[in-house]
C-alpha cells in the first residue's frame, strides 16, 4: 500500500502556534521532509523539534535553492517530488513541513502538485500565517 504526503504548515515561528493537526501528523508520520536552502539554517526543523521528538524520525532534506532561475527551481521541485515518491512507494507517510501555511506562497505547493500529478495522494494542512500572527501580536484585526 502506498503512503500519503501531507504538506503541513507549521506557522510563523512560534512553536505554540502549530496546530493540533500538525503536531499529530508529525508524531504519526514515518518521514519528515524539510526544505533546505543554500546555507545551514533550517528554520522549520528548529521550530518543530521544540514540539515533536524528530530525532526518532526518518528525515528527508529537500534542497530548495534561493534563485530566480525557473529551470533550477523546477529541477529542485521535481527532485523533491521524486524523493518523496520513493518513500510513498515504500508505504511510508511523509510530512513535508513549510513555514506559515502551504496555501500562501509556500515551497511545498510545487512538490504537492507534482506528487498529485504522478497519481499519489497528497493533502494540504493549513498553518497559521505570518500576517494573521502579526495582527494578533499587535492586538488588532485585519
Q: Which positions does each model-derived feature cover?
A:
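Glycine-rich phosphate/diphosphate-binding loops that line cofactor/substrate pockets in enzymes
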Residues: 1, 25-28, 82-92
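Glycine-rich, flexible N-terminal cofactor/catalytic loop recognition
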Residues: 1-64
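Glycine-rich, highly charged phosphate/nucleotide-binding loops
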Residues: 13, 73-85
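General beta-strand structural signal in soluble alpha/beta enzymes
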Residues: 34, 61, 96-98, 124-127
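Short gly/pro/ser/thr-enriched loop/turn and capping motifs at secondary-structure boundaries
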Residues: 39-41, 67, 129-132
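Short, hinge-like loop/turn segments at secondary-structure boundaries
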Residues: 50-52, 78, 139-142
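N-terminal glycine-rich phosphate/adenylate-binding segment common to multiple enzyme folds
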Residues: 79-84, 92-108, 112
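Class I SAM-dependent methyltransferase SAM-binding "motif I" and its flanking Rossmann-like core
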Residues: 100-142
Amino acid at each position: 500500500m502506498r503512503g500519503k504526503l501531507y504538506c503541513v504548515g507549521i506557522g510563523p515561528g512560534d512553536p505554540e502556534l502549530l496546530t493540533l493537526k500538525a503536531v499529530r501528523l508529525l508524531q504519526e508520520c514515518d518521514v519528515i521532509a524539510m526544505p533546505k536552502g543554500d546555507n545551514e539554517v533550517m528554520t522549520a526543523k528548529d521550530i518543530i523539534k521544540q514540539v515533536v521528538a524528530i530525532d526518532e524520525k526518518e528525515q528527508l532534506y529537500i534542497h530548495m535553492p534561493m534563485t530566480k532561475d525557473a529551470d533550477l527551481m523546477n529541477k529542485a521541485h521535481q527532485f523533491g517530488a521524486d524523493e518523496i515518491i520513493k518513500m510513498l512507494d515504500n508505504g511510508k507517510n511523509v510530512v513535508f513541513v513549510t513555514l506559515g501555511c502551504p496555501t500562501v506562497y509556500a515551497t511545498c505547493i510545487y512538490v504537492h502538485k507534482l506528487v498529485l500529478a504522478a497519481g499519489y495522494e497528497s493533502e494540504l494542512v493549513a498553518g497559521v500565517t505570518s500576517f494573521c500572527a502579526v495582527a494578533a501580536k499587535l492586538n488588532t484585526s485585519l
